[in-house]
Amino acid sequence: MGDNHQATLSNDPAANAPDAAAADKGKGKAADEPSLEMSMDEEEDSDESEAEEMMADDDDDDDHDNLEPISEANIISGGRRTRGKTIDFQEAAEKLKAEDEMDDEDDDDEEFQPNDEDMRD
């Protein structure tokens, strides 16, 4: 600082050692914020143009609402989804039900008796 009590700000990375090291590491400087010197007329114009752009985007969505029905020729038949294996869904449901009943028997906590000797200090 000089005698006039003003700080000198510099954009030179060599003037400040930590900034110089950061510049060498590939970290860029922050982008300047857009200026706020826009007049009121320009602001209103940009709002209107944004609204028009939003309406144009909505028009694109309307094109997709008129979908054609699915052609049956595109539906895969012949069990290709199960790789040729036939599945008996009733048998699979019974098997799952039996497994669930076996798991319920293992979860009985009524028979559990804690060992109080292990809990003492």
Swiss-Prot record:
Stretches the record annotates as Disordered: 1-121
Keywords: Chaperone, Nucleus
Biased composition (Low complexity): 11-21
Entry coiled-coil feature ranges: none
Ranges of biased composition (kind: Basic and acidic residues): 22-32, 85-99
Pfam families cross-referenced by the UniProt entry: CHZ (PF09649)
Cell compartment(s), UniProt: Nucleus
Subunit comment: Forms a heterotrimer with H2A.Z-H2B, stabilizing the association of the histone dimer. Also, with a lower affinity, forms a heterotrimer with H2A-H2B.
Similarity remark: Belongs to the CHZ1 family.
Role this protein plays: Forms a chaperone-bound H2A.Z-H2B complex that acts as a source for SWR1 complex-dependent H2A to H2A.Z histone replacement in chromatin.
Protein name: Histone H2A.Z-specific chaperone chz1
